[in-house]
Amino acid sequence: MKIKAEERVLNFLQNHIDYILLALILCLSVGIRFTVRFFENGDAINYLIPWYEQIKANGGIFGGLSKPIYSFDGTVCNYSFVYQFFLAILSHFPIKPLYGIKLLSCIFDYLTMFELARIITLLIPEKKVQKSRIAVVVFAFHPVVFMNSALWGQCDVIYCFWILLALDMFLREKHRLGFIFYGIAFAFKLQAVFFLPFLLFYYFYKKRFSIINFLLIPITALVLNIPAFIQGRTIKDVISIYTGNTNMYKIISMGYPSFWNIINDGLKKEGYSSLKYVAIAITVAALAIHMYVWLKRGVALTHKNMVYMAFLLTFTTVFFLPSMHERYGFVYEVMALVILMLYNKTLPLYLGLSTITLVMYGKGLYSTNYNVVLMAVANLVIYIGYTYLLAKKMLKTETE
């Protein structure tokens, strides 16, 4: 015979089983990230940890940004002052450098998953609970996500979060906030520029706000660099980090299975010198073709179509540009999860996309060998598949 207290507990558990299960799942995802905190790879040993230790030695938030910091091989740090300042804050806590670096990215894992839920709730109000929960669980346990932040210690999820927040604001037509959040993403990492083609198209097609709003991007970035300016760094120093990133790599691909890997394995500088400007030109042309078709066919700027457009333009930019790292697809891969919740026919493409990225991460983390040409061809097939399915969806006369 049950006592009343026991019955109340059982009733509570039954009535809140969905929330309890979700909480348990999220706790398990935290546990996964915790178990890999010890892992060190070349990026952590040669770059991230030396940067962290130098920032701490220079005074943390009270001087850690006052002078250049260097990697193990003597290369000057090419991560933004905004990211460096976050490391400076962490340096004042009693935590190992490696754990602090990973903790920062893991915090943004969870901010990003809840921003995903917020976007999906807006896009699919009739199934917002079911779809948003599925997306949160998939993101929480996605190997690419926790490998990037908790295993690798990289910060791609940080600028990804701010890009998603910017996209959310544009969906809600809060344009100034959208530009401010995009400015924060850009302040963290130059790779936020992959989202810029969508913003330019959105501005041109929407005609709802002034081009002056684009000034909010550099203004926001400069405001976030105030801690560095206070410590003696200059605007020239800020700009040099971005320009240094564009000139650092001299091979056609840095691990990402780009279009150009179909004809060049990316290991020789000769391929880079002969294809660099061709690749940039083809990227611009591919972006222009997408935009032209949407304009000529009068594709409606519905919320769902905006997400499709943002995804395709970001994917196009990364796929055709030279010198892309394997991690640079992170933003469009997260957008692909949103699209999967909108359009379940993209499931095979999403699984293929995730598998390719896992193979690339295996190379970066564990030196696993793979056929780069085969991966590039597979990525091309997935790109074409997404282009076809989403174009078919967008070109329907009725709005969704």
Regions found by a protein language model. Name each.
Residues 14-50, 59, 106-109, 141, ...:
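Transmembrane signal-anchor helices characteristic of membrane glycosylation enzymes that use polyprenol
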Residues 13, 17-20, 113, 122, ...:
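Aromatic/glycine/proline-enriched transmembrane-helix motif characteristic
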Residues 2-3, 8, 194-219, 230-231, ...:
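Perimembrane helix-loop-helix junctions
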Residues 1-35, 107, 121-122, 132-134, ...:
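Start-transfer (signal-anchor) and selected internal transmembrane alpha helices
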Residues 115, 158-175, 335-336:
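Specific aromatic-rich, kink-prone transmembrane helix
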Residues 47-78, 82, 92, 232-242:
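Extracytosolic helix-loop segments that constitute the early lumenal/periplasmic catalytic or substrate-binding loops
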Residues 81, 85, 95-114, 270-281:
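Loop-to-helix entry region of an early transmembrane alpha helix in multi-pass inner-membrane enzymes
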